[in-house]
Each structure stands twice: as C-alpha cells, then as structure tokens.
Amino acid sequence: MKSTKSLKMEYKKIHLDLLKISKKNNHSSFLNFLKSSPPKQLKEFNGELSVYLSKTIVGQQLSTKAAKTIWERAEKFIIDHPLQNRNLENDLRESGLSQKKCEYVKNILISNTLQKKKNYYKTIGAEEFTNLLISYKGIGPWTVDMAKMFFLGDINILPKGDLGIKKACNNFFPNEDLDSIEEIYKPFNSYLSLNLWDSLD
C-alpha cells in the first residue's frame, strides 16, 4: 500500500503531466483551467463493492442533493447486516428509493460475488470486472466506469456516456471527439475526468 506522502506526490505529478499534454496539443482553454485549479485527487471508496454499487444506484438520475439525502436514510439499512434484514426492501422504500431501485440494491447486497475483498476485483481484469457488474440489473456502462474509477482506483477512465463529461469536453475541445481526447490524455483519463467535472461547478 502506498504511503500518504507518495499518493500526494503522485496526484501532483499527474497534474503536471496533464499540463504538459494540454500544452503539447494546443488545448489552451483547458490548459488555462488547469493552471488556475488545484491538483485533483482520485479517492477510492473505502468499503465493500456491494455497498459502493448500492450507493451509485441510489444516486442515479437524481440531483446531488437528493441523492445525498436518500443515501443518508438508506445507508444504515444497507451497511448493517443486510442479509439478516428481512424487511430490507420495505426499509429502502421508506428511505425514498423507487421500487425498481429497491430490487436492484437488494439483488446486489445478497450476491456473494460482490462481497469479496477489493484486491480480488483488482486482479480479475477490466473485461471480467465489467462483465460481472453488467450482469446485475440496474448496472450499465456508466456505473461500471464509476466503479472502476472510485472503487478500484483506475487512473485511466473517461466515462464517455456521462453528460457532464460530454458537456465539458465540448467546452474545452469543440473540434475533437471523445475517442480522440481519450487517446490524447491516456493514461490519465480519470484525472482528466475529475477536472472536467470540476469545470462545470
């Protein structure tokens, strides 16, 4: 495991790499944004994959504020021995989740395959991880990308289906498509994504 100091140096170095890449490719608007912004950190979720996926599903198609409110209500039912909670679906419904989201979350929480230690998912390979996740209802490409970034800590993810990413890329790189941008900023696309999201705030 990397020390706090080495992690701090790593994200600062990546910020410098982004500056170099944007300058080399004449992305002046993005370069100016990077110069005026602090280095972004990619923070891994500290918990089980099933809990991370549940939290992500709770927040789907909701504003950040609404997602936070509902998660704060539902979290205790999801984390505190969900397998022993016979009233889990009812508890989730009362927390504000739709019927479909309740079903999705319950199926994720009762899956033994999603209860393994994080290192297991880091070693099975990206394709197998993707196939595992999308086999569950309620999980699509966007959720897989979020899990790769914020659960596994993959530094090279550009979630091309994300509306915010599309909007920010159109602002900074109006003459280039997402595939081209992804290739240009490889292998630091997750840090590119963090900056793109931040530019919309």
Task: Locate predicted features.
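N-terminal polyanion-binding entry modules of DNA glycosylases/AP lyases
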Residues: M1-I124, S180-D201
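Active-site phosphate/pyrophosphate- and oxyanion-stabilizing loops and adjacent acidic/basic residues
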Residues: T56, N131, K167, D179-S180
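Hydrophobic/aromatic-lined pockets within catalytic cores
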Residues: L62, L152, F173
